[in-house]
């Protein structure tokens, strides 16, 4: 078998084929488990107390409002919010700021963070919903309100029903038609129904979700005429609501779940995608032109809503009550801050215990609060500052403990990955010593990456979840990238093929003494470079996601590298087979004694 090859080529090709098949199998498994751990992600540390609920006495304070309305404008970037005169006018009556949406910047991910106060790595909803919800969400504003028999309402896209439907009392859902002919009208329908229901049924907590602008951005981008027309229509809708009597004596929060890149798309960490507007108006709100002295996080929205309504703070909340935005007395702010701190300290303790650690004394909230109030006496302002300082210190300590646990995992991964890569590199150095062939193989690798990444970046992509615009386009997006990878791989052989014409050797000789040696070396070193890139990701985040999320651009790059490894190895096996058939056809005839004639070899 393979008699047309030299003995060295035959041996090396056998080694490469076995290596390639094993590599394809291993990386297929890696792709399956890595991708699956993201799609089906659930924090394994939090899972033991994921469904716990907060103590309704310790984690809630007296209500300061009868009704609160949260408006989520789907897909509105902070930069585009300035193009809405209705919001500009509303700024004079509200406090507003730019907030950063946590990654991945998907709608369901942001909604869960708004409703639970938990970061995505805690609440676990980091992929599109699909046909049904993967598991019941943790304690959230809707369940907390229900525990106090408060009426809740949602007016928006049907995905809200999938996520929270069983805990919502009043609802109106409007989905898009298959031909998308109702994009402009859908926001108007939702707002009209919301205003009618809120006016007559008076739910304590209402969510108005306007999904139309997001769909327009996906289809046409943010620079087109369609987007401008939709902004004008959206401005009219918001003006109708914000000038109505519904905003009187009610708290109103306006925000967005994410923005869009200019060409349309979200999910990544681009400034236009993560930067959104936060506006708050209502009784006792300190209306200013802008908030420059206070950092507002996305997780702060949930505990602020719960504190205003006087309902329990969700158990996994990691945000803070935005006390500085309100003018009501300090003693009321203190009561609400203590409710949040009671919840957070218990959550921090349970997280550390579940991760196998020992909670530090700083998580003993009651003792710290007692000391703060004792030292401040009746100076409520001093007590408020003391509680804010304690909350920051406890939050920093909690973050440090989580980072410390990840550090030891990274150290372990560093040792075993370094050993594997070092052994692989030592094998390559020992096996392939011919400088000319090494130079040819490395030059081919440079050509391959230059062509592949050149095409990718030329098309305006940047290893972001925003690149493929919508999850529905993910498969077609990846198929196009696979085609580009195959083209880049085939084109990288161009210099090697040109060598065949310049050397003026018989095809048989060139294949045996130039092509196959360089081909084998190229594929081994290409595999090493891809393995090294995958190893860096695994070192940083692990082969599967268990209790933390990666930076999403790194995760997408890792997925691409796995795909490249599998694809290049599979295509290279086909190239090797095709090259051998050509070699066998071009092989010189043997003489009667079984010896090749030198004239036919050369």
Q: What is the role of each PLM region?
A:
Residues 2-66, 584-602:
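N-terminal secretory/membrane-targeting segments
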Residues 123-127, 222-224, 262, 281-291, ...:
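Flexible glycine/proline-enriched surface loops and loop-helix/loop-strand junctions
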Residues 256-286, 334-336, 464-469:
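Histidine-centered active-site microenvironments of extracellular/periplasmic hydrolases
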Residues 327-419:
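Phosphate/adenylate-binding glycine loop and adjacent helical scaffold
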Residues 404-602:
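Alpha-helical transmembrane segments of integral membrane proteins
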Residues 51, 64-202, 301-303, 307, ...:
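Active-site-proximal alpha/beta segments of enzymes that process anionic O-linked groups
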Residues 13, 20-23, 32, 36-39, ...:
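A long, amphipathic alpha-helix that forms part
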Residues 109-116, 268-313:
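Substrate-binding rim/cap in mid-to-C-terminal beta-strand-loop elements of soluble/periplasmic
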């Amino acid at each position: 078998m393979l008699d047309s090859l030299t003995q060295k080529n035959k041996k090396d090709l056998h080694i490469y084929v076995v290596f390639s098949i094993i590599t394809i199998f291993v990386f297929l498994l890696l792709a399956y488990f890595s991708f699956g751990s993201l799609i089906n992600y659930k924090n394994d540390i939090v899972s033991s107390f994921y469904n716990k609920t907060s103590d309704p006495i310790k984690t809630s304070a007296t209500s300061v409002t009868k009704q609160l309305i949260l408006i989520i404008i789907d897909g509105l970037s902070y930069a585009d919010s300035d193009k809405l005169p209705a919001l500009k006018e509303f700024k004079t009556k509200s406090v507003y700021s730019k907030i950063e949406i946590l990654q991945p910047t998907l709608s369901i991910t942001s909604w869960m963070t708004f409703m639970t106060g938990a970061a995505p790595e805690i609440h676990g909803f980091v992929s599109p919903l699909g046909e049904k919800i993967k598991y019941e969400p943790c304690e959230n504003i809707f369940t907390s309100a229900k525990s106090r028999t408060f009426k809740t309402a949602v007016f928006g896209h049907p995905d809200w029903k999938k996520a929270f439907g069983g805990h919502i009392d009043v609802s109106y859902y409007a989905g898009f038609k298959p031909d998308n002919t109702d994009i402009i009208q859908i926001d108007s329908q939702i707002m009209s129904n919301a205003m009618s229901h809120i006016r007559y049924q008076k739910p304590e907590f209402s969510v108005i979700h306007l999904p139309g602008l997001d769909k327009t951005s996906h289809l046409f981008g943010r620079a087109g005429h369609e987007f401008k027309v939709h902004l004008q229509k959206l401005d009219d809708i918001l003006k109708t609501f914000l000038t109505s009597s519904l905003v009187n004596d009610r708290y109103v929060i306006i925000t967005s779940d994410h923005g869009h890149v200019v060409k349309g798309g979200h999910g990544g960490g681009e400034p236009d995608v993560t930067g959104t507007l936060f506006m708050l108006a209502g009784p006792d709100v300190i209306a200013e032109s802008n908030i420059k002295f206070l950092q507002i996080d996305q997780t702060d929205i949930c505990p602020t809503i719960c504190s205003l309504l006087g309902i329990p703070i969700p158990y996994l909340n990691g945000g803070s009550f935005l006390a500085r935005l309100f003018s009501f007395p300090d003693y009321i702010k203190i009561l609400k801050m203590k409710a949040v701190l009671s919840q957070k300290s218990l959550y921090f303790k349970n997280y550390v215990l579940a991760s196998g650690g020992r909670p530090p004394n700083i998580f003993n909230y009651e003792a710290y609060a007692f000391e703060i109030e004792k030292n401040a006496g009746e100076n409520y302002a001093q007590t408020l500052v003391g509680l804010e300082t304690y909350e920051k210190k406890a939050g920093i300590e909690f973050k440090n403990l989580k980072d410390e646990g990840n550090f030891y995992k990274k150290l372990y991964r560093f040792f075993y990955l370094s050993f594997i890569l070092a052994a692989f590199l030592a094998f390559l150095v020992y096996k392939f010593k011919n400088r000319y062939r090494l130079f040819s193989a490395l030059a081919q690798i440079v050509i391959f990456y230059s062509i592949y990444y050149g095409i990718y970046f030329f098309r305006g992509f940047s290893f972001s979840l925003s690149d493929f615009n919508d999850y529905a386009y993910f498969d077609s997006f990846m198929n196009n990238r696979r085609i580009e990878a195959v083209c880049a791989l085939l084109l990288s052989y161009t210099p090697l093929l040109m060598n065949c014409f310049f050397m003026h050797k018989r095809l048989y000789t060139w294949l045996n003494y130039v092509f196959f040696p360089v081909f084998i070396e190229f594929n081994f070193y290409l595999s090493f470079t891809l393995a090294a890139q995958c190893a860096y990701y695994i070192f940083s985040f692990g082969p599967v996601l268990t209790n933390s999320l990666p930076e999403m651009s790194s995760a997408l790059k890792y997925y691409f590298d796995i795909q490249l490894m599998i694809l290049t190895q599979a295509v290279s096996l086909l190239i090797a087979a095709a090259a051998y058939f050509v070699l066998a056809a071009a092989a010189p005839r043997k003489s009667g004694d079984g010896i090749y004639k030198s004239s036919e070899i050369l």
